[in-house]
């Protein structure tokens, strides 16, 4: 038989039906976030601080430098932070140096940077005692993008381009009318492309044509050519950006230079530079073209490739190795727009190879005209020091160049020319020697590492745009994962730090500009309060910082692997189209095509696929087996390589259904494989990679659905989403029919305790486990017992190891909520029959056995927290007190309170019971002596205090599980004005009942409609009664046939007393199912004769019966069932409040109105719309009439109509409301007026 027995952990063995040869272990499922946070802590912060370094005063006298960062450990442990409602944070410090540039003196000290929340081992943050998760954001990568649209009128493709940085100005190219190409800089008005090229420094048309070639479209873009040069072009570009403002050439040049090439304003980031170099590489465009000229080694004059060579991949590699011969200098350092203008450059080199710099012009005392340093003076440290001492006498340009920001030598090194790689090609063989048809391909300088855009990049991006019209280059698919990347927690925090530091920089600059070096140090000048505020706001309010979904381990794990396109810098949910939401072929093995929300966020929130990793640039990778050819045979090796979507493009990858021989060679000569996202059939010799596993396409939640391949995609989506809503049960049970990932999902979720070192268990109880290694080193593990989760469910860890057990590093030591023997256990294995029963399971309703209720099969425990605080009241009013002496209540109400007035743990409480007795002073708390005497004699404390006790809210109750008491007297840290804080935790057992929602793993959800006694239930020939009856009509239309296969396999496995693993796309097939059914002595159709429990007669037809794994969802009737007799009304509309928590009414909507109309219940309808809703006068009159036994009055004007009138009056409209009998205008009549007229 096609299976093997596999052990999962030390406790569970499953019969695994997987067919693949190599069973690759899953990577750590939550390491992505921790790795990113650790990078930020180690390198990211210091990198960022260097971008802001130094901060100098406005006159340049003082500078602050930031050095090494270090941190101090968290004040509280993870558990203490949760208990005390504190944040789990570290304090970050930075070593700061204050320098006096005039004297060279320095002062050093450490400065508090911020309090930074620290990530826990399980990938969460604790903010104010609550666990939160930072969700990764998927965004468009900074790069150069080109797109095309087909113009029906012109019958041709129109191209557009965008140069997009992480921060800074965008450059956009587009084609306008009359075939003129235009450019927009930073979303400004457009200018002709030719003018933009002039502005870059090209002074005449001949030079432009020499670089870009004789492109017809570029020629048509030359407008107003006769008076156009670099200066005029710069002025025009400045005018477009600044909305018509006119300035001199130098000002315009400096403005454009700072807008595009200033590192503080323009940032590509490392990934942006990588993408720019990859996109603008001249060799990436040159493939499948012909060389115009011989490609020559300029040093030896040897011909590397002769002219007319057809550039194949091999020839491109030869060019790549000799690419330095493609470089041409387009501008020297003096004419490079990136560099500062001539007037600002006060140095030059006598020898270009030397490091020596000389002053270019005389440096004068601008007050007297006296020469301080003549030209040709060698620039030394002594010269710089003398200049600093004479700073009051120097011209602003001299100060700017010699004494501000960067070192003068560094400035000179940065003054470089513009180099581009240029290649001339023909598109076809027929065009050889026809110079009119040659195409110029200009690429950027591939050695460039700058984090901002360069002139070389801009020139290359223009060339790429022109090449598109000539048939060279490719347009980009923005939804391809090669162009989208993840911002992990490290990068998200770095962006927040940048915002905070930008705000702090201005404040620090203002401070040091008004301070004297002798009077202050770095500690007094540097204040990073802005940074602290930004970090707190991010963790508390950002869409990417989410309250942790702790209801079960799968929900926890899925949230940590979630990917969101929403949030700051992401996509707006309201404007997102179909394309960005849709499944893309590049998602294969990277993002799950199934798991996504069903509402307005569909497609914008996704989950990482099961094997997916993230590279250093943030691109999602997926693993493949490398395929080798040896002795003429292609074989799949066990060598694993992780590829991004871009790297995968040109590879031919065998899809996961390939069949292998025992020596790992392909069985068939042709293999189904993918190339560029398209599926085709390829000879096995051409295949370069093979899928690592059939399940690599889906996420963890989706991979836990057995027989996924037999379900409709929308039902699979519901199945994966509903598993995350499973409530932890009192008694857990792992599925008989699993998929093999239950163990790993539970282990990596963070809800279990994993052994951190090998050893032998020396002590075990319900609260701790102690292990000892060979050297005698002890390790203690504290268990979590009876704690409340974020979703108010019970967290209880139970040991699964015994005294003397030998454990290894990585072993699971305990079971937590929804786990069993270290495996994920969200529900229970129950006996299911697909049959109808008196119509009670119509429309997905579910009938269950009373035995499930009696035996606590689906019983769950829920814990609610209630808290109360005592405060100092305003001056002279006293303070609130916790006491047992609550006024105006009987002895029965306080019988379960201790001497302090706090409920005793273990007490059973119901709605309205006092949990904490509290009194609040009211009125005058300083009575006269006579009043004091009366109070002492009579004991009337009730008159001066009111009862403000904490009571069990409406609809709640249970057993008091624990009480926490915090007091300022005991040294606990409490908010200002709070003296005491008491928390009461109430646990409640919820048995399954009518109205609760249940589901299988195949999207087969339903609500319990009837709980039948055991004696009424259908039973099998051996007397076994059915646990659950499901409607068979729920299967064909939903097309989730997986549930039928599951019950057949489950029944066989239960009879054989085994557990089964059937991995998705690679599990039990038709033949396997037949064989295991025969092994279990079951009928091949999986049907049985059932007998009616009421009559004992057999049903007419045989019925499908089997074992299905069903879960109880968090949508429980106890949370939703609600009725209202009387209750509060909203103040404005006077209609009943909404919601159970406010004791609100049920919504009476349009459809309910139609139903009452149809029944002809006129008076009921009138009452619904008037006296039972918002007719204030009418409801008072009705109350009086009922009490006095009179006839009910006619309704009056509803309050909502009065609200409408007030809104019309607020618009300035004159409204009259004339009463027919009195002819009075009642529009402004108040309720008081009505009372005076006799309405009660």
Curated annotation (Swiss-Prot):
InterPro entries hit by this protein: DNA-dir_RNA_pol_bsu_external_1 (IPR019462), DNA-dir_RNA_pol_su2 (IPR015712), DNA-dir_RNAP_su2_dom (IPR007120), DNA-dir_RNAP_su2_hyb_sf (IPR037033), RNA_pol_bsu_bac (IPR010243), RNA_pol_bsu_CS (IPR007121), RNA_pol_bsu_protrusion (IPR007644), RNA_pol_Rpb2_2 (IPR007642)
Annotated GO MF terms: DNA binding; DNA-directed RNA polymerase activity; ribonucleoside binding
GO biological process per UniProt: DNA-templated transcription
A Pfam family per the record: RNA_pol_Rpb2_3
Reaction(s) catalysed by this chain's protein: RNA(n) + a ribonucleoside 5'-triphosphate = RNA(n+1) + diphosphate
Transmembrane parts of this sequence: none
Domain of life: Bacteria
One GO CC term, this protein: DNA-directed RNA polymerase complex
Keyword annotations of the record: DNA-directed RNA polymerase, Nucleotidyltransferase, Transcription, Transferase
EC number: 2.7.7.6
Catalytic class of the enzyme: transferase
The protein's role, per its UniProt record: DNA-dependent RNA polymerase catalyzes the transcription of DNA into RNA using the four ribonucleoside triphosphates as substrates.
Family per similarity comment: Belongs to the RNA polymerase beta chain family.
Family matches, as NCBIfam families: PRK00405.1, rpoB
Complex and partners: The RNAP catalytic core consists of 2 alpha, 1 beta, 1 beta' and 1 omega subunit. When a sigma factor is associated with the core the holoenzyme is formed, which can initiate transcription.
Protein name (record): DNA-directed RNA polymerase subunit beta
Organism encoding this protein: Phytoplasma australiense
């Amino acid at each position: 038989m096609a299976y093997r027995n596999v052990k999962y952990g030390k406790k569970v063995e499953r019969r695994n039906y997987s067919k693949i040869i190599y069973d690759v272990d899953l990577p750590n499922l939550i390491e992505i976030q921790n790795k990113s946070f650790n990078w930020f802590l180690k390198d990211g912060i210091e990198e960022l601080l260097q971008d802001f370094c130094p901060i100098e005063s406005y006159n340049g006298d003082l500078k602050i430098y930031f050095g090494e960062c270090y941190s101090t450990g968290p004040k509280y442990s993870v558990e203490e932070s949760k208990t005390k409602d504190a944040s789990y944070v570290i304090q970050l410090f930075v070593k700061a140096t204050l320098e006096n540039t005039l004297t060279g003196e320095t002062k050093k000290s450490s400065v508090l940077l911020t309090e930074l929340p620290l990530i826990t081992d399980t990938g969460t943050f604790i903010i104010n005692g609550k666990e939160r998760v930072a969700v990764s954001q998927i965004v468009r990568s900074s790069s150069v993008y080109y797109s095309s649209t087909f113009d029906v009128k012109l019958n041709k493709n129109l191209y557009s381009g965008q140069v997009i940085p992480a921060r800074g100005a965008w450059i956009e190219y587009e084609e306008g009318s009359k075939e003129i190409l235009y450019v927009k800089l930073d979303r400004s008005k457009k200018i002709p492309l030719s003018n933009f090229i002039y502005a870059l420094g090209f002074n005449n048309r001949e030079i432009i044509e020499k670089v870009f070639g004789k492109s017809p479209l570029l020629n048509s873009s030359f407008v107003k050519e006769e008076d156009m040069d670099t200066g005029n072009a710069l002025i025009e570009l400045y005018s477009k950006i600044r909305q018509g403002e006119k300035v001199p050439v130098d000002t315009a040049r400096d403005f454009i230079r700072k807008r595009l090439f200033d590192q503080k304003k323009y940032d590509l980031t490392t990934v942006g530079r990588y993408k720019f170099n990859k996109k603008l590489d001249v060799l990436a465009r040159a493939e499948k073209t012909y060389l115009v000229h011989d490609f020559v080694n300029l040093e030896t004059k040897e011909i590397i490739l002769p002219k007319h060579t057809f550039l194949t991949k091999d020839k491109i590699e030869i060019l790549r190795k000799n690419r330095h011969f493609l470089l041409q200098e387009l501008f020297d350092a003096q004419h490079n727009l990136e560099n500062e203008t001539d007037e600002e450059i006060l140095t030059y080199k006598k020898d270009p190879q030397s490091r020596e710099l000389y002053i270019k012009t005389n440096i004068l005392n601008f007050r007297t005209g006296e020469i301080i340093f003549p030209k040709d003076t060698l620039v030394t440290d002594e010269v710089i020091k003398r200049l600093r001492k004479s700073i009051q006498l120097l011209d602003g340009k001299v100060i700017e160049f010699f004494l501000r920001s960067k070192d003068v030598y560094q400035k000179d090194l940065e003054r470089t020319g513009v180099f581009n790689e240029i290649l001339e090609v023909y598109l076809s063989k027929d065009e050889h020697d026809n110079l009119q048809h040659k195409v110029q391909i200009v690429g950027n300088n591939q050695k460039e590492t700058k984090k901002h855009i360069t002139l070389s990049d801009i020139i290359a991006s223009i060339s790429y745009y022109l090449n598109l019209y000539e048939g060279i280059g490719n347009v980009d698919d923005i939804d391809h994962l090669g162009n989208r990347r993840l911002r992990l927690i490290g990068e998200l925090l770095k962006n927040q730090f940048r915002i905070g530091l930008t705000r702090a920089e201005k404040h620090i600059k203002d401070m040091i500009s008004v301070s004297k070096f002798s009077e202050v140090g770095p500690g007094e000048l540097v204040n990073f309060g802005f940074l602290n505020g930004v970090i707190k706001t991010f963790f508390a309010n950002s869409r990417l910082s989410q309250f942790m979904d702790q209801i079960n381990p799968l929900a926890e794990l899925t949230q940590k692997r979630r990917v969101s396109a929403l949030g700051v810098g992401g996509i707006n949910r309201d404007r997102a189209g179909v394309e960005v939401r849709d499944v893309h072929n590049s998602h294969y093995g990277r993002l799950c095509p199934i798991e996504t929300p069903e509402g307005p966020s569909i497609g914008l929130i996704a989950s990482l696929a099961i094997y997916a990793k993230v590279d250093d640039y943030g691109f999602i990778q997926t693993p493949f087996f490398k395929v080798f050819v040896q002795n003429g045979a292609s074989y799949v090796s066990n060598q694993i390589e992780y590829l991004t979507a871009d790297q995968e493009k040109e590879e031919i990858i065998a899809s996961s259904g390939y069949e292998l021989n025992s020596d790992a060679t392909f069985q068939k000569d042709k293999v189904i494989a993918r190339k560029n996202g398209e599926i085709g059939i390829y000879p096995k010799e051409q295949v370069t990679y093979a899928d690592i596993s059939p399940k690599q396409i889906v996420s963890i939640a989706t991979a836990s659905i057995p027989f996924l391949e037999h379900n409709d995609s929308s039902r699979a989506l519901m199945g994966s989403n509903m598993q995350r809503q499973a409530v932890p049960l009192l008694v857990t049970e792992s599925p008989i029919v699993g998929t093999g990932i239950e163990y790993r999902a539970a282990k990596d979720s963070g809800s279990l305790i994993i052994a951190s070192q090998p050893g032998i268990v020396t002590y075990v109880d319900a609260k701790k486990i102690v292990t000892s290694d060979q050297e005698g080193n002890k390790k203690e593990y504290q268990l979590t017992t009876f704690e409340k989760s974020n979703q108010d469910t019970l967290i209880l860890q139970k040991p699964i190891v015994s005294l003397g057990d030998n454990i290894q590093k990585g072993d699971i030591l305990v079971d937590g909520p929804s786990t069993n023997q270290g495996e994920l256990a969200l529900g229970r294995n129950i006996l299911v029959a697909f049959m109808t029963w008196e119509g009670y399971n119509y429309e997905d309703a579910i009938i269950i056995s009373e035995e499930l209720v009696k035996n606590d099969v689906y019983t769950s425990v829920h814990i609610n927290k209630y808290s109360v605080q005592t405060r100092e009241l305003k001056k002279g009013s006293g303070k609130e007190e916790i006491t047992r002496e609550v006024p105006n209540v009987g002895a029965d109400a306080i019988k379960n309170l201790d001497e302090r007035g706090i409920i005793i743990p273990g007490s059973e409480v119901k709605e309205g019971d006092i949990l904490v007795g509290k009194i609040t002073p009211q009125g005058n708390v300083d009575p006269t002596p006579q009043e004091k005497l009366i109070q002492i004699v009579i004991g009337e404390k009730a008159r001066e205090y009111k009862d403000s006790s904490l009571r069990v809210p409406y609809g709640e109750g249970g057993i008091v599980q624990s009480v926490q008491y915090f007091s300022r007297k005991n040294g606990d840290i409490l908010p200002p004005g709070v003296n005491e804080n008491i928390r009461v935790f109430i646990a409640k057992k919820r048995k399954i009942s009518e109205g609760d929602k249940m589901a299988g793993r195949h999207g087969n959800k339903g609500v319990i409609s009837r709980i039948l006694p055991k004696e009424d239930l259908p039973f099998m020939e051996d007397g076994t009664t059915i646990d659950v009856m499901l409607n068979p009509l729920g299967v064909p239309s939903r097309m989730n046939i997986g549930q039928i296969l599951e019950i057949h396999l489950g029944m066989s496995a239960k009879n054989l007393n085994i557990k089964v693993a059937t991995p998705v796309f690679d599990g039990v097939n038709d033949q396997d199912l037949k064989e295991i059914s025969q092994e279990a002595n079951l009928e091949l159709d999986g049907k049985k004769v059932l007998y009616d429990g009421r009559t004992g007669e057999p049903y007419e037809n045989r019925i499908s019966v089997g074992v299905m794994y069903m879960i109880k969802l968090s949508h429980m009737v106890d949370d939703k069932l609600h009725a209202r007799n009387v209750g509060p009304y909203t103040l404005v509309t006077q209609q009943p409040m909404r919601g159970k928590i406010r004791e609100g009414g049920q919504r009476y909507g349009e459809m309910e109105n139609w139903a009452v109309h149809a029944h002809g219940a006129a008076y009921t309808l009138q009452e619904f719309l008037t006296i039972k809703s918002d007719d204030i006068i009418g409801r008072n009159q009705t109350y009086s009439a009922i009490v006095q036994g009179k006839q009910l009055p006619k309704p009056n004007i509803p309050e909502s109509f009065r609200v409408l009138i007030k809104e019309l009056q607020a618009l300035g409209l004159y409204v009259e409301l004339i009463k027919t009998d009195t002819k009075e205008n009642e529009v402004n009549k108040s309720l008081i007026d009505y009372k005076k007229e006799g309405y009660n």
